[in-house]
């Protein structure tokens, strides 16, 4: 089947028992046992649930992996993956990593002597120079959040394999519709499914897909042991959201390209971060490893413009956390998504106070552009 059909018919399609077209919501915590050690495949919903299992098989199909796992949030998924490591291990991470991922590494896993090395993962030599006997994995976001840096997944995976390391890719911004990290050589893919996969800002979920049986067994053990599983109802909502992923992502892509072109030469804006510009340093890599440029843009306001006033002037675009919904969302990374990252690191990589991150929705693109134009004009200090 082609990808668009797998979105609708992949995983467990419908219900054989009743003939229902959609997978039912198995809203149960426990299951009747036939006898000692004898059951119909389920014992307790933390360990396994038919609705969640349908979702897990679906995301494994979409990412072309060996096993999929559904968690109660993107951070629960990330935490499960980081739980693969032990005291003394180090992980190479990008220098503008999502703030929540940095926080869990810096404030929680560091307590267990699991460390990290911050590098510019777009620079392959810098990655190589930071590999030593303690490094166990290279963690990649591409595009990065929020500066849209592009890392060559295939080349990073080659480095990992030659050093017996894991390659972990957060594929939230791209989704498997645009980019398939496992096919490019990654070992583990993570999604905050709250975002584009769910697509409607009505659920919180995380997904993990792995490329081999050993990792499948390990992640399943961690999932069951730590218990951060996705509920049956949210699993159902996510399956439903995924069905329309292709049509939504096509609209996100086209709208975002138009918005980026609008922002590019505005006098109020100092810089636009968008991997779909040919002058973007990662454009050729992005064009090679993905079939689109996504629905995210970040931009820096010029001096003389107040980001606080800009947010106040927005009307159609919502000022708020998150991304990837049908509605356009704007946020302030320095105080919101990346507030957990130390000020010095934020300044060094470019997460400055005047940086705004925009998740372009699927509204009429002219309405989005007009809203941005009003907000940009309204953000002028004493103007």
Language model: regions and residue ranges:
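Glycine-centered tight turns that cap/initiate beta-strands
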Residues: 64, 134, 268-271, 316, ...
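Positively charged, small/polar-rich N-terminal and surface patches that mediate targeting and assembly
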Residues: 2-4, 10, 271, 278, ...
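Conserved N-terminal alpha-helix of the aminotransferase class I/II PLP-enzyme fold
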Residues: 30-79, 83-84, 100-107
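Conserved small-domain helix->loop->beta segment predominantly found in fold-type I
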Residues: 257-321, 342-343, 347, 383
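Conserved PLP-enzyme active-site core in the AAT-like
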Residues: 9, 69-268, 273, 284
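N-terminal "arm"/small-domain region of PLP-dependent enzymes with the aminotransferase-like
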Residues: 1-49, 55-58, 356
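Short, well-ordered beta-strand elements within core beta-sheets of diverse protein domains
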Residues: 238-247, 294-302, 357-361
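PLP-dependent enzyme catalytic core of the Aspartate aminotransferase-like
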Residues: 106-107, 115, 129, 133, ...
């Amino acid at each position: 089947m082609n990808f668009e059909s797998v979105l609708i018919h992949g995983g467990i399609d419908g219900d054989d028992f009743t003939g229902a077209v959609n997978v039912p919501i198995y809203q149960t915590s426990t299951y009747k046992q036939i006898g000692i050690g004898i059951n119909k495949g389920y014992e307790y919903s933390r360990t396994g649930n038919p609705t969640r299992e349908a979702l897990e098989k679906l995301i494994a199909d979409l990412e072309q992996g060996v096993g999929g796992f559904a968690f109660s949030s993107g951070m629960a998924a990330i935490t499960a993956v980081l739980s693969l490591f032990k005291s003394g291990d180090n992980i190479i991470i990008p220098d503008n990593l999502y703030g929540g991922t940095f926080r869990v590494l810096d404030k929680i896993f560091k307590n267990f002597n699991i460390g990290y090395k911050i590098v510019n993962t777009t620079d392959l030599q810098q990655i190589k120079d930071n590999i030593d006997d303690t490094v166990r994995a290279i963690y990649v976001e591409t595009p990065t959040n929020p500066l849209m840096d592009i890392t060559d997944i295939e080349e990073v995976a080659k480095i990992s394999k030659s050093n017996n390391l894991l390659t972990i890719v957060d594929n939230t911004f791209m989704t498997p519709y645009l980019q398939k990290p496992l096919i490019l050589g990654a070992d583990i893919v993570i999604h905050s499914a709250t975002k584009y996969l769910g697509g409607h800002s009505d659920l919180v979920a995380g997904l993990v897909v792995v490329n081999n049986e050993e990792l499948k067994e390990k992640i399943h053990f961690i999932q069951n042991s730590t218990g951060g599983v996705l509920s049956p109802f949210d699993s159902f909502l996510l399956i439903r959201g995924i069905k329309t992923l292709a049509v939504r992502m096509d609209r996100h892509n086209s709208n975002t390209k138009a918005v980026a072109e609008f922002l590019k030469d505005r006098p109020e804006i100092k810089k636009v971060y968008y991997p779909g510009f040919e002058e973007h340093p990662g454009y050729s890599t992005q064009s090679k490893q993905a079939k689109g440029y996504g629905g995210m843009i970040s931009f820096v306001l010029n001096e003389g413009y107040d980001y606080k006033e800009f947010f106040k002037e927005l009307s159609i675009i919502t000022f708020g956390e998150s991304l990837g919904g049908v509605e356009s969302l704007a946020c302030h990374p320095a105080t919101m998504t990346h507030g957990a990252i130390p000020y010095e690191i934020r300044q060094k990589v470019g997460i400055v106070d005047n940086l705004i991150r925009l998740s372009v929705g699927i509204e009429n693109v002219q309405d989005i552009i007009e809203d941005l134009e009003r907000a940009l004009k309204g953000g002028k200090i004493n103007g």
